[in-house]
């Protein structure tokens, strides 16, 4: 529901970062701030507490982050506090990361296997995906013993399922269909 807003905030910050040639730096700073917030339960409770005023939250953010992050990122955080959206900072970071990848003609492929891919398998898969999507491909590997064997690939919500588990499931459906006749 809020993806549109997340994207608007992220795009606004991305444009500022791009103008200043600091996209990677700003992404890293946002990631660091997000990690600090998510890993400190007291800080997270503080920013989510409804009885703590916006002014107090902004003052705290200025005290904690001023001089440690860029003024643009600090201003961005203060705007999110004003708008009551600071607790969705991770969503903004994720959207900004997507915008960065789009602008660099790159996609992320989530690849699930039972055992880690060998270097040559990873290179072959990357090259095939690069040709299929006509984009640079970053492989994000995940181990998943439930797929039994084979490979499961997801790119931009498109799935390529070459797993043993899916083949067994297909065979089961065919066999059950045959019994019903």
UniProtKB/Swiss-Prot annotation:
Tree of life domain: Bacteria
Compartment annotation: Cell membrane
Keyword Membrane: yes
Keywords: ATP synthesis, Cell membrane, CF(1), Hydrogen ion transport, Ion transport, Membrane, Transport
Protein task: F(1)F(0) ATP synthase produces ATP from ADP in the presence of a proton or sodium gradient. F-type ATPases consist of two structural domains, F(1) containing the extramembraneous catalytic core and F(0) containing the membrane proton channel, linked together by a central stalk and a peripheral stalk. During catalysis, ATP synthesis in the catalytic domain of F(1) is coupled via a rotary mechanism of the central stalk subunits to proton translocation.
Family: Belongs to the ATPase delta chain family.
Protein name: ATP synthase subunit delta
Taxonomic path: Bacteria, Bacillati, Bacillota, Clostridia, Eubacteriales
Gene: atpH
């Amino acid at each position: 529901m809020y993806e549109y807003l997340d994207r608007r905030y992220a795009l606004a910050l991305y444009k500022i970062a791009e103008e200043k040639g600091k996209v990677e730096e700003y992404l890293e700073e946002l990631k660091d701030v997000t990690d600090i917030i998510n890993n400190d339960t007291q800080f997270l409770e503080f920013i989510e507490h409804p009885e703590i005023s916006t002014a107090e939250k902004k003052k705290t953010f200025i005290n904690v982050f001023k001089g440690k992050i860029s003024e643009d990122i600090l201003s961005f955080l203060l705007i999110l506090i004003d708008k009551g959206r600071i607790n969705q900072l991770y969503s903004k970071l994720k959207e900004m990361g997507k915008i960065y990848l789009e602008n660099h003609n790159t996609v992320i492929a989530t690849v699930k296997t039972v055992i880690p891919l060998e270097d040559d398998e990873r290179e072959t898969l990357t090259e095939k995906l690069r040709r299929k999507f006509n984009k640079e491909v970053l492989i994000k590997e995940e181990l998943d013993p439930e797929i039994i064997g084979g490979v499961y690939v997801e790119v931009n919500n498109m799935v390529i399922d070459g797993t043993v588990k899916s083949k067994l499931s297909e065979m089961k459906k065919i066999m059950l269909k045959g019994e019903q006749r």
